[in-house]
Amino acid sequence: MNETPKPNSFRSGPDEDGRFGIYGGRFVAETLMPLILDLQDEWNKAKNDPAFQAELKHLGAHYIGRPSPLYFAERLTAELGGAKIYFKREELNHTGSHKINNCIGQILLAKRMGKTRIIAETGAGQHGVASATVAARFGLPCVVYMGATDVERQAPNVFRMKLLGAEVKPVTAGSGTLKDAMNEALRDWVTNVEDTYYLIGTAAGPHPYPEMVRDFQSVIGTEAKEQMLAAEGRLPDLVIAAVGGGSNAIGIFHPFLDDPTVKIVGVEAGGKGLQGDEHCASITAGSPGVLHGNRTYLLQDGDGQIKEGHSISAGLDYPGIGPEHSWLNDTGRVDYVPIMDHEALEAFQTLTRLEGIIPALEPSHAIAEVIKRAPKMGKDEIILMNLSGRGDKDIFTVGKILGMGL
């Protein structure tokens, strides 16, 4: 593909049609279009409303626990013998991941729009837990669609959602993972447009979702930039994050996009290897197409049918990626690379033993890339990585693979 021309700013998108270059847009059923336009209108008003922003900031500080710390991984840095490694500790947020940043923002929007029912999709269950959490906090009923495969491998999060009062609906269609859960949630939304708000968890879906989710998650990069300047007096040389749909990644990347000295890398799920279909590396091994209301890189066959991807990590097990990532790839601003299941598993164990932090399997993919790159960099160079979630939810998966009975 010809390289997309570089814009004056990498931070000015999307355009009024919700496009990032040829990606994004709004490909939705006619019934949903009025709702999408209404949502966009409300979002435009909310982001320019000081009262909305003040409430968001207040809940960020007192409910989520922001700002999350910037942590220097001293032992990992010493072990690898190269660049200084810093983690943005999003796993310390309320509910254990970055997902809550977006959920708080969207539930405030749902309340503003007068919606009385929340629906959400979830893969790893982290977004489901965060959605159920904010629904409980604001007294709204919540239905979470979750692939049957994920229900099985993320039992602790399913229990959490139920404890929080949400109804968890297992989806058996397809491979019973995130894509299928999103399909069901969209069907529900079409049927219940009047009272229902669809709280999308990733930076994908029809416009304005990719922009909205990015803006709510950009608090990660904005804080990290400030914290890095305070800690080191300069910006990092490299920013790394794991990418499934891509909300944690775009959240840390976006504030750095117009800083030319900062190299940015997104890490996709390479699964069992790119030669077969058992991976979720949409950019590395996919092609552009339309899924879930937007045009983006997808895993699809020659007839445009969506393939069933695979990843050890339920949160990266999605056959697409947010449209802004597709555009950032084509412009060359961000490099996207795959990490295999076994590499992520090894990184999971390395971080746990060296730093006393049990990471989720999603950011373990990013840790694996850090482990590859840090030794090749100078000791005066700095890596910033988004540690997007904690690994409590993954101990059963990891225990099973390592042959440790739980």
Swiss-Prot record:
Give the EC number(s) under which this enzyme is classified.
4.2.1.20
Say yes or no: keyword Amino-acid biosynthesis present.
Answer: yes
> Hey, which pathway is this one from?
Amino-acid biosynthesis; L-tryptophan biosynthesis; L-tryptophan from chorismate: step 5/5
Spell out which residues are annotated as carrying N6-(pyridoxal phosphate)lysine: K99
Tell whether Lyase is among the UniProt keywords: yes
Q: What keywords are assigned to this protein? A: Amino-acid biosynthesis, Aromatic amino acid biosynthesis, Lyase, Pyridoxal phosphate, Tryptophan biosynthesis
Q: Which cofactor does it need?
A: pyridoxal 5'-phosphate
Q: SUPFAM superfamilies given for it?
A: Tryptophan synthase beta subunit-like PLP-dependent enzymes
The UniProt catalytic activity note for this protein reads: (1S,2R)-1-C-(indol-3-yl)glycerol 3-phosphate + L-serine = D-glyceraldehyde 3-phosphate + L-tryptophan + H2O
Give the molecular function GO annotations.
Answer: tryptophan synthase activity
Identify the PANTHER family for this entry.
Answer: TRYPTOPHAN SYNTHASE, TRYPTOPHAN SYNTHASE-RELATED
Give the protein name, as stated in the record. Answer: Tryptophan synthase beta chain
Q: Which organism is it from?
A: Rhizobium leguminosarum bv. trifolii (strain WSM2304)
- Tell me the lineage of the source organism: Bacteria, Pseudomonadati, Pseudomonadota, Alphaproteobacteria, Hyphomicrobiales
